[in-house]
Amino acid sequence: MLCMNSPTSSTRSQSDVCIVGNGAIAKTAALGFAQAGHSVTLLAPPAAPGAADAAVTGTAEQPWDVRVYALNHTAHTLLSTLKVWGALDADRVAAVDSMVVNGDGARPGDLAFDAFGAHVGALAWIVEDRNLNQALDAALKFAPKVQIVHGRATGIASDDAGVTVQLEGGGSIASALLVGADGGQSWVRGQCDIGIDYRSYHQRAVVTNFSCEKPHHGVAHQWFTGAEGVVALLPLPGQRVSLVWSAPDALADTLMQETLSELAVRLGVLCEDKLGALRPLTPEMVKEVPLVLIRPHAMVAPRVALVGDAAHVVHPLAGHGMNLGFADVAELLATVAAREDQRSIGDARVLARYARARKEDVFLMQLATDGLARLFGTELEPLRVARNLGLNLLDKLPMIKRRLMAHAMGK
């Protein structure tokens, strides 16, 4: 791997694939294309001052990252194939053996899934953002066909011969394919004039970690509370859990103003102390993320493919935003690998196949998460009764439950 700052006005970089982004999805795409034999330029933002000093190694003594992902089997398979999964700090990865979804009201509904019923070893794996990115960075260091450029792009031009990204300072990166993996506010998407449907949920995800008095036994809990939003407690190694509270804006303001000890007490009451007393695990570390729905009108443009949040942003109540991104990367790699010999990796027909292959999966996940967010966000009593009855009914229909589990696991 070669790492450099933005090329100067006299520098024109050439590679098979240029990937814009600096998150786990961008790094996974870079690694995947490199391992498939393609030369790759990963265009990342300029490094922040002191970033190198902050990039400490993953140890048991390191504070637990409040940003975690519930990775499904598609993500696990892709990362294993790229030899990344084995590089994760296994002591900081927790398997989800079962999941319990709890309704609200006087007669709350319940829905339970477990790995045994799905005939798998785990439903998902909880991985910290830091742990994942450190493993990807380590793998990229040994990828000879990857060049990482730190700089800012200023424009994109594409033609039949390829696509060129112009850089601040006058340099450029030419490639056969440009991959936009630059997040929900994607610069690449905007440069390609791909419109979006945007809606705010007027909610924010409040995230932090706690230690718990009782063992969680690998169970992920989710509570649909109506007025207080959706609360998820995800298992971390040992007697630790990660909180993702999708709260209405007014409540999120209150939660962010409380001390973590006060938040722990509030959470214990809401969750009926299922895990016993909760104690702050990462002192003074709590973050919030605005929750929105973003539906781009296309996933591809001439010589350009979007992946991850650049291609779709969904409500986190199903925990599958990151998994959709990994599925995008897996599909793009497979589609490019299966192209006819005479076609370039950025050929319009190749990219159209990628977009078609991802359309249904993305649409269904957007439909499901948006529908659930709307259904469980209402306080109308008839709908509250109906949704709880629906949870109870679904729990008694094993065939449908198995299909839901298979889709959620990416199988």
What do the predicted segments below correspond to?
Residues 59-89:
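N-terminal glycine-rich dinucleotide-binding loop that anchors FAD/FMN and/or NAD(P) in oxidoreductases
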Residues 26-27:
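N-terminal Rossmann-fold NAD(P) dinucleotide-binding loop
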Residues 334-411:
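C-terminal helical "tail/cap" subdomain of flavin- and related membrane-associated enzymes
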Residues 12-13, 86-191, 199-207:
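Conserved N-terminal helical subregion
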Residues 79, 164, 171-172, 178-279, ...:
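Conserved FAD-binding catalytic core of PHBH/FMO-like flavoproteins
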Residues 253-346:
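FAD/FMN-dependent oxidoreductases across multiple families
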Residues 10-23:
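Beta1/beta-strand and adjacent pyrophosphate-binding region of the FAD-binding site
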Residues 20, 34-65:
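Glycine-rich FAD pyrophosphate-binding loop
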